């Protein structure tokens, strides 16, 4: 753990013992099992006392790091399939979950709990489902007088249980939910938010990230394979809805058992200055081949028509 001026190290020794060193010290201040780090970014009280004034600095630094880590929300690439109905325990969950399994609980709380800010989440989710053109409205319905509720999707005048609609909606629902549920100022890490979505909906995800980032001071870290999402992000920069400094993009190159991240350099028009080779395949080559084949096929058809007429 370090600042610009100081560096603190806890090095593991034999039999589970740790030694504590500051800056470029070659000899440890002390070593022993009682100096084992806590949660990898802080040291126990014995080590803090041992370091004296440096201990207070390390304690403040560790606390700052832990607070930053607590502001990170992670959602994995495969979200849990929805149930046909859910029991609501009249409380608000503390998290969406790494597989999105609490997303529906969040929506139930948003729809059913009283409060000026409660409906914000379900309204935000519904708005983006409409913009993605995958639904007209999302609704929570009570089953009789029970504590069980179902999530209903309205589309083209038809309503259906969430479990009965396309899997793309159930996969993107936790993504939309966490965008509004995470506390303002959070960092949201998403893997493949575009999974099972059609191209337009994938593109709209870029708009979601841009708008929610500004509205709620959210930083999104997104791992994606979607060219549609990437292209729309470029367009948003060209439209001046974002600046090139608002959206950093990286290309991950795998070499053997290791991987390297290469920053993509974008200008003010969203154009990439340093395209990696075959980043999106040979798009220009595909277009050229399609055009050549279309011309050749058109000539063949005209020749065939001429022979028939003769």
What are these regions (language model features)?
Residues 1-79, 140, 237-243, 247-254, ...:
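P-loop NTPase switch/coupling surface
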